[in-house]
Amino acid sequence: MCLRIGSLNVDEFRKVLMKTGLVLVVLGHVSFIAAAVLHGTMLRFVATTSDAVVLQYCAVDILSVTSAIVVIVAGISTIVLSRYLPSTPLRWTVFSLSVACALLSLTCALGLLASIAVTFATKGRALLAACTFENPELPTLAPDCPFDPTRIYSSSLCLWAISLIFCLAESMSAVRCAQLMHGLLELRPWWGKSCHHTIQASPEPLDAHDLLSCASSCS
């Protein structure tokens, strides 16, 4: 029972998968928290308006939450696969989730970038749609404003920038995971050298003896 992908033996490959899965889980949780904080501090107050810019903000936030959930699921699946490499259905599941994560995270990053650009272009006027001021150019605390209008602009831009960074990191990690699955599934085209032997379709994790025998036979 042996598996070798490129220069990695089974033990090394399992460790790489485990680390990749953990990275995806952490990034997904942070992105989810950032999107939730953004919704709680700003979007829930302006989401009732019919402004096109506000609708774009809400759509991007929903996409961010969806992307974060898919990334977390992909990370957990990758961690499980690191323990159960013989499972072919699980390999395809992780590969599909990784590709979906990469596309969703990239789309989310583009949406966040658009939100930041629109906010700069409009000077954040859409963020103050729920408030009424005598002078829109000088927002001050008002009884009919559900939040602090003097901080909503900088807070929103900061949260969007954080989410953008993590979406890009998610996309790169998902691409890395998809690359690992591409080699494990031996899909074509594949230019890396590999030594692949049949693995028994057993749900049990590979033990240390199997790993050592694999490393020696494929070296």
Curated annotation (Swiss-Prot):
GO CC list: membrane
Residues spanning the membrane: 22-42, 62-82, 94-114, 155-175
User: Which branch of life, at top level?
Assistant: Eukaryota
Question: How does this protein lie in the membrane?
Answer: Multi-pass membrane protein
Q: What is its main location?
A: membrane
Q: Is this entry keyworded Membrane? A: yes
The reply to whether Transmembrane figures as a keyword in the UniProt entry is: yes
What's in the keyword line of the UniProt record? Membrane, Transmembrane, Transmembrane helix
Q: Where in the cell is it found?
A: Membrane
Instruction: Provide the family line.
Output: Belongs to the TMEM54 family.
Q: Which PANTHER family does its entry note?
A: KERATINOCYTE-ASSOCIATED PROTEIN 3, TRANSMEMBRANE PROTEIN 54
Q: What is this protein called?
A: Transmembrane protein 54
User: What is the organism field in this record?
Assistant: Mus musculus (Mouse)
